[in-house]
Amino acid sequence: MSEIPAELYYTDEHEWVLRTGDDTLRVGITDYAQAALGDVVFVQLPDVGAELTSGESFGEVESTKSVSDLYAPVSAKVLAVNGNLEASPDLVNSDPYGEGWLVDLQLDADDMEAALGGLLDADGYRGVVTE
């Protein structure tokens, strides 16, 4: 069974979201997603400062099996990208909830609760992966 940490939020598209501050979030792909992808060989991420729209593609994860789009869990600005993935894309496999994070996002603090409210909790995501 895939690891699904209770403190994170999730999307139907297998991204996880961690609230890191009043107006900031960290995003990655779930353990379930990395296992389904297989060995990750390349990660394409947006530029810092890019504006992401909830539900729209913001990058790609390429594995030995396939190429999968990454979808923005919320509408926000890219604050940082994980530069370590350029040389070590396999971090997505070995540590999807830690060193394998993808992007840090910033949104208006007033919009945070509504944005997180649109995401799944661990139990909701568990329902998605066991269907």
UniProtKB/Swiss-Prot annotation:
Record key words, sorted: Lipoyl
Cofactor: (R)-lipoate
Cleavable signal peptide: none
Record Gene3D superfamilies: 2.40.50.100
Coiled-coil region: none
Cofactor annotation comment: Binds 1 lipoyl cofactor covalently.
GO biological-process terms attached to the record: glycine decarboxylation via glycine cleavage system
Family affiliation: Belongs to the GcvH family.
Protein name, entry field: Glycine cleavage system H protein
Organism: Mycobacterium sp. (strain KMS)
Gene that this polypeptide is encoded by: gcvH
